[in-house]
Amino acid sequence: AANQHLCGSHLVEALYLVCGERGFFYSPKTXXDVEQPLVNGPLHGEVGELPFQHEEYQXXGIVEQCCENPCSLYQLENYCN
């Protein structure tokens, strides 16, 4: 799919479609959240093995990433829980 601008409800709907039951977030609250996004989640013991690359996408938050600039579905997936 081509990159597209997604704002407001369109952005929420796109995240819901991409992430499904995993849920999603817009931007990290603290640096700790970025490093351990699933600490209390179902994958608690596996977090260290997953290749998280959230920092580069979350530095500015998903609104800047996908509303002010066009973004891809691959980028949206970085905001799934």
Curated annotation (Swiss-Prot):
It comes from the Eukaryota. The keyword Disulfide bond applies. InterPro entries: Insulin, Insulin-like, Insulin-like_sf, Insulin_CS, Insulin_family. Disulfide bonds join 7-67, 19-80, 66-71. Coiled coil: none annotated. Its main location: secreted. It holds the Pfam family Insulin. The keyword Oxidoreductase does not apply. Signal peptide: none annotated. Keywords: Carbohydrate metabolism, Disulfide bond, Glucose metabolism, Hormone, Secreted. GO terms for cellular component: extracellular space. Gene3D superfamilies: Insulin-like. Residues 33-58 form a propeptide. PANTHER family: INSULIN, INSULIN/INSULIN GROWTH FACTOR. Insulin decreases blood glucose concentration. It increases cell permeability to monosaccharides, amino acids and fatty acids. It accelerates glycolysis, the pentose phosphate cycle, and glycogen synthesis in liver. Belongs to the insulin family. Heterodimer of a B chain and an A chain linked by two disulfide bonds. This is Insulin. It comes from Anas platyrhynchos (Mallard).
